[in-house]
Amino acid sequence: MTITIPQISIDEVYISVLKAKLVTNEEGWSKMMPIDHAVRPSGSIIMDALVTLLHKKRLYYPTEVAEYFQKKTRDLDGAIRVLTGMSLSRFMLLYRLKQVQEYLCCTSLTAIEISSRCGYPNSSTMGYLFRKEFGMTPGMYRQAHRPRNYNELYAW
């Protein structure tokens, strides 16, 4: 008998970088509602701790995460690989790029500000990795995905 462990996706555990979002209720009233930054339980203590850490701290390397948890990088990488199907470094990359996407779609922050907030050493590195992953520059992504009235829809 084989037991399959369901893989956890970035979207399932991602914690928004936004502070509030405009919500319209059934009666048609619109109101800025705070976004819940609590961890959505994944069923894994390791994953929940990792997501909390990535949300609160600007960590760039898997070794930094392993040091924080006082674990060997190899052991932590193996656990994340079992839980997500990807290495710790790949998970961290995709998690940070998800943050970049959200900032691009919902804010007027510059590439330099976004790269700093997402833990990149500079905007060139962020842009290179973004292009490599999504096949377009951050500016092109922003142009294609940010609504005209973004500043009325989101608070960051």
Set out the residue ranges of the language-model regions.
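…primarily DNA-binding HTH/wHTH and HhH modules…
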Residues: 3-28, 32, 36-39, 128-156
